[in-house]
Amino acid sequence: IDELDIPTLGTIVHEYIHFLQNVSTPWGLYDSMVRYNIMAETYAFVENATSTITLPLDIDYSPELANKIAIVKCGMGYCPLADTRRNDFRIDVNERICIHRKYKQLNNRTLPVITLDICFTDGSKQAITLGANIIKESMAALYQMLIDETATHERYDLPYNLVKIIAEQHFSAIASDNIKLITICYISLFSLSPAEVLINEL
């Protein structure tokens, strides 16, 4: 590690934070268990098939697993890194991000949904659902920038700089305290509703 340059060390720390998010938080463990159950039921579907299997698979997961998948999907929120519709996620920080809180009924649970109205520097606007995807990336990027100040992820404010930008616009008292922002991101992953906890704690 002593021989690594600062950018490489920062990248390694960023990815190691993702490892910790996945193995040391209730959200990470719940998500992993749901994915494992998906693999188990998929394997059982293939193993028990009595006719030719066609792709893509169309599996009716058990009601219990389907419910857990819906909880994870709701908590994960939007994933900009999987969005192929745009390749520049620079946020216009002069336009205030609007935060909306709604609720979604899922069987016998009421799940909070936090949506954000975001303006980009190219003039386009987008409403996104805040969730663990963005929170995890923002947290890892904040850690990375503690080591490598040049890792600003300029073209990718969403997801890497979003928590910082929200803090600067709405919670200025803590916006300059990156350690506190990292801590709040981490705390939010101790819930099945990470976005709500993040906004509440900010």
Locate each region found by the language model.
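Long, well-structured alpha-helical subdomains associated
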Residues: D60-L202
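Short pre-active-site segment immediately N-terminal to the catalytic Zn-binding motif
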Residues: I1-V13, A127, G131
